[in-house]
């Protein structure tokens, strides 16, 4: 991730704060109310960017897993782990915000007949199981290889989950983006874009923060082994 290595972490954190301030202001003071859902529709500007960021996190984790298998890189293995960890966090927030939105708008927390919901849950649980695999095997190249293969298998679920909304024609998940363009007003689309960029910036900030922490922890362990 060469771009993030060139930009200091505090700069990313500062940009994230600024972007979120702008996004929240636009969500509550710029974007118009939905005629059918009213104020509750504003959850959309949080829920969908969070979900897309979760997809991006899992995808980035799979890409780093592929790089590990190709180059046998411990760094790529660590980056894959951190990306998937962030994906699980954003996945949890996706399920939480989606359930709240569904309860307010449609009177139910969950609909098992909705393909998008169920497939995202399967994707989420699949990557949760990644950590069960990782912590059940001794650290080393064998564990890194197994986790990388597992992460790559999971990436197949991402387009299936993403495209489910276009296949199922769900009422709970109306199709917002079509071949004819976004099905929203200009101000709504601009607000959505700013919120999405803010969420991606948050992911990069958390990703780099966790990576830095893991690297420091690894160096401390190496020093302890040398001293011992």
For the regions a language model picked out, list residue spans one by one.
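Polytopic transmembrane helical bundles with strong interfacial aromatic enrichment
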Residues: 1-228
């Amino acid at each position: 991730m060469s771009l993030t290595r060139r930009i200091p972490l505090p700069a990313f954190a500062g940009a994230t704060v600024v972007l979120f301030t702008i996004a929240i202001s636009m969500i509550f003071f710029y974007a118009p109310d939905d005629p059918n859902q009213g104020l509750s529709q504003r959850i959309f500007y949080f829920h969908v960017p969070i979900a897309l960021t979760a997809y991006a996190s899992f995808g980035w984790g799979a890409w780093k897993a592929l790089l590990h298998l190709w180059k046998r890189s411990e760094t790529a293995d660590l980056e894959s782990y951190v990306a998937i960890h962030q994906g699980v966090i954003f996945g949890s927030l996706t399920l939480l915000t989606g359930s709240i939105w569904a309860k307010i708008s449609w009177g139910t927390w969950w609909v098992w007949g909705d393909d998008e919901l169920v497939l995202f849950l399967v994707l989420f649980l699949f990557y949760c199981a990644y950590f069960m695999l990782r912590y059940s095997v001794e650290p080393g190249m064998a564990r890194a290889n197994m986790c990388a293969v597992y992460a790559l298998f999971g990436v197949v679920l991402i387009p299936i989950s993403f495209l489910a909304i276009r296949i199922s024609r769900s009422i709970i998940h109306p199709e917002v983006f079509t071949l004819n363009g976004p099905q929203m007003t200009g101000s709504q689309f601009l607000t959505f874009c700013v919120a999405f960029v803010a969420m991606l910036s948050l992911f990069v900030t958390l990703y780099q923060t966790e990576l830095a922490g893991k690297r420091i922890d690894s160096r401390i362990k190496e020093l302890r082994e040398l001293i011992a």
